[in-house]
Amino acid sequence: MTQNFTIRQARPEDDAARATLLAPTYGADAAGLAAEAADIRHHFRDFGDLAPGIVRLVAEDANGAILGALEATVRLYANGCESVGVMFLEGIAVAPSCRETGIAAALLAQLEDIAREAGITEIASDSRIDDAVGADFHLANGFSEAERVTCFVRKIDG
């Protein structure tokens, strides 16, 4: 099958399209995600378009339409990993009409190349415990289940 898309680093003008694709993955609204991307870019403007440790990739067709998006961060630790400094797949999404075309695999391959070039040896990810589709995606793309955890949050006043 001919690959009818290219993978590249996301640019600011991709924020709305990326947010539309990724919003269901994050259980968020697209406008909020696009605003968050702009806010991160503003806070890290001295570092160029991307904040340190944040990877944002898109799959784009010949007409410039965004068909898929991936976000990852470098974390010091991720559950189940053996190394310090782990690439963490925060979210990945492909337009419904473009699924099963190799876009997700190509996005993951590019992320792996970026991680390898940075000396990172593991990519981690997560999905909600009740998300069978997410679990199936990870397993089909070379991830193995490491552990199950319960997450907690403590708010800080002031």
Task: For each feature predicted by the language model, list its residue ranges.
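Acetyl-CoA-dependent GNAT
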Residues: 5, 9-12, 24-84, 90, ...
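Hydrophobic pocket/interface hotspot
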Residues: 18-22
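Conserved acetyl-CoA-binding loop of GNAT-fold acetyltransferases
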Residues: 139-148
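Conserved GNAT acetyl-CoA-binding A-motif
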Residues: 115-127
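Hydrophobic adenine-recognition pocket in adenosine-nucleotide-binding enzymes
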Residues: 10, 92-94, 127
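Conserved acetyl-CoA binding element of GNAT-fold acetyltransferases
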Residues: 83-96, 150
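Conserved acetyl-CoA-binding loop-helix of GNAT-fold acetyltransferases
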Residues: 94, 100-113, 140
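Conserved beta-strand-loop-alpha-helix junction that forms the acyl-donor binding cleft
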Residues: 125-134, 153
